Amino acid sequence: QARAMEAAGATIIDSGGESTRPGAPDVNLDEELERVVPVVEALRAQSDIVISIDTSKAPVMREALAVGGDLINDVRALQEPGCREVVAEYGVPVCLMHMQGQPRTMQANPHYEDLFTDIENFFTQQIAACEAAGISRDKILLDPGFGFGKTLQHNYQLLNELERFHRFNMPLLVGMSRKSMIGNLTGQPVDKRLAGSLAVATVAA
């Protein structure tokens, strides 16, 4: 599937072994390693495409980077033990995502005192922690976490004022493709959300 995506024009492949969709169960370390590391190793042997590792576990980060991973994409923003140290050691880029709660419960009742202030404070704290661990500021990307502990209103408020995060002077990763925020607005099932995905991506850009 990764090779087909590259042939279709993909420039980055995101490889993960644990679903982070709302309500998703946890995956143990051994199983995640078995799901991720062989795939990264095989893909690297056949391609120079950028490989992003979607994980929140330091051992998975370490082993996947050792066999050819290029970037860490962490929905928990390197807050789990040992993660910052691994990223600092390998000197790779990292995407820090904001998520309120955990995947299993994050959509139960999302609430913010002030949406942007809360997320900006989170990013400020995590950027400082990364720099203290030896991660260069120019290696950090930020993801406001559309659909991760956010109501429909929160998601579209973020989209409408996304430029507020420009103050960090860091690249923004915006992941909205086929998400429920599109389906809830358009009434379309997952396989019919391409037009909506393109529309919100255009607004974000």
Predicted regions located by residue number:
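Active-site-adjacent loop and "lid" segments of alpha/beta metabolic enzymes
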Residues: 1, 20-48, 55-59, 65-66, ...
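Catalytic domains of carbohydrate-active enzymes, especially glycoside hydrolases
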Residues: 1-16
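Phosphate/pyrophosphate-binding loops at sites that engage ATP/ADP/AMP, CoA/4′-phosphopantetheine
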Residues: 7, 11, 126-139
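Short, conserved beta-strand segments within well-ordered enzyme catalytic domains
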Residues: 14, 50-52
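Conserved Motif II region of HX4D acyltransferases
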Residues: 145
